[in-house]
From Swiss-Prot:
Residues spanning the signal sequence: 1-17
Protein name: Nucleotide exchange factor SIL1
Keyword Signal found: yes
Keywords annotated in UniProt: Endoplasmic reticulum, Protein transport, Signal, Translocation, Transport
A Gene Ontology biological process term: SRP-dependent cotranslational protein targeting to membrane, translocation
InterPro entries: ARM-like (IPR011989), Sil1_fungi (IPR031884)
Length: 383
């Protein structure tokens, strides 16, 4: 097999956020898949070991990927390579040549010329979009070219076609690529804030409403993954304005962002608490508890929205009210999930089972009367 070693930009905070010390060692830290059970937290050895599906990777390990199969392996770092680490983040030499140095040099030269030929820029970027989704190449593009791509997105005189291609490249690089996410969050902590404001400004100025909605979706698709593990400072007013865009996809993306921010606030660290400069908790409680009832949502979106709503209600209690039909929806979901848990004979997806339990328990403990929880769930407690 052909293994390619990766340079990882792993921030200690992001990696530690994936491990809950309060549940470490419990049954929730075991994954069962394909007839095999193994720890959720990957334990590295001196030799290369395979990272199994769903395992969390501690920071600071050497990692390599089989480019033909996508399988990952990790090991403890070699001592003489430890000098490459600073503050838990591997140093990336973004000035070195790589596969696309020549192409991006052409783009950079046009931008710096004072009278750029954007047809040249468009051709180069269009040829590069397909490579950005590659795990290794996407990381190289982000670490070498992110500053340039930012300039193209934020430039006032840059054509929308160039902004679009720059956005598509970043979206492709970030998709399912944790090293890219960690690199951007660590090196460019204000990027999310500026991008949301760019989305608002573009929406105001655009003359083509359809084109504007499409580009706003791209910007939000960049923001979404950057907030999964790493809370960022956010201007809530920008999100409020974007939520007014008459597009269901845009509105769902805004709610997913808000849900992740509120979920992050529940960890009680300073960065999470500053993620929202001001917060209209009642409005977002209403919108989240209304949107989660949609029949068109998949399980992933239901979980994401619910975690944010759960965090909101836990933090603010009776000070916030859910949408009038939410408690009825929650009661139906609770009964359906309890029934599924009693009927399932085969081992279930751990993450789904964990979420089902959270939803069931929260019906009375968080969203209703805690005194009713034990009575209503005597049978469930014995599962």
């Amino acid at each position: 097999m052909y293994w390619k070693k990766l340079l990882f930009a792993i921030a200690s905070a992001a990696a530690l956020a994936a491990v809950d010390p309060e549940t470490e060692g419990s049954e929730l830290q075991t994954i069962c898949s394909g007839g095999e059970c193994y720890p959720r937290l990957f334990k590295a050895l001196q030799d290369w070991s395979t990272i199994k599906e769903g395992q969390q990777i501690p920071p600071g390990l050497d990692i390599r990927v089989d480019l033909s199969t996508g399988k990952k392996q990790a090991r403890l770092p070699i001592p003489n390579e430890a000098s490459n680490m600073e503050n838990g983040i591997q140093v990336v030499d973004d000035s070195s040549d790589y596969e696309f140095t020549k192409e991006f040099q052409l783009v950079r030269a046009q931008v710096a010329s004072g009278a750029p030929d954007y047809n040249v820029v468009i051709k180069q970027l269009d040829d590069l979009v397909e490579y950005a989704s590659d795990y290794t190449l996407g990381y190289k593009i982000i670490t070498h070219e992110f500053t340039l791509l930012q300039e193209l997105i934020f430039g006032q005189d840059v054509p929308i076609s160039v902004k679009e291609l720059s956005s598509r490249i970043i979206v492709a690089c970030l998709r399912n690529n944790t090293p890219c996410l960690d690199f951007v969050n660590t090196r460019f902590p204000d990027f999310v804030r500026h991008l949301l404001q760019e989305a608002v400004d573009y929406g105001r100025q655009a003359t083509d409403a359809v084109e504007a909605r499409t580009q706003i979706k791209r910007y939000l698709s960049i923001v979404e993954p950057l907030l999964i593990n790493e809370p960022q400072p956010i201007n809530e007013e920008a999100l409020k304005q974007l939520y007014e865009v008459n597009d269901q996809t845009v509105q769902l993306k805004v709610l997913l962002i808000m849900a992740r921010l509120y979920k992050g606030r529940s960890h009680n660290d300073d960065i999470s608490k500053r993620s929202l400069e001001s917060t209209d908790v009642q409005r977002w409680t209403t919108e989240l508890s209304k949107a989660i009832q949609s029949k068109h949502l998949d399980d992933f979106h239901v979980r994401e929205l619910f975690h944010g709503l759960y965090a909101l209600k836990k933090e603010h209690g009776r000070a916030v009210k859910t949408y009038p039909t939410f408690l009825g929806w929650l009661a139906e979901e609770t009964e359906a999930r309890k029934q599924r848990m009693t009927q399932d004979k085969q081992p279930r997806d751990l993450e789904q089972m964990e979420f089902d339990r959270l939803l069931i328990e929260s019906r009375h403990m968080v969203f209703g009367n805690p005194m009713a929880h034990r009575i209503k769930n005597m049978e469930y407690d014995e599962l």
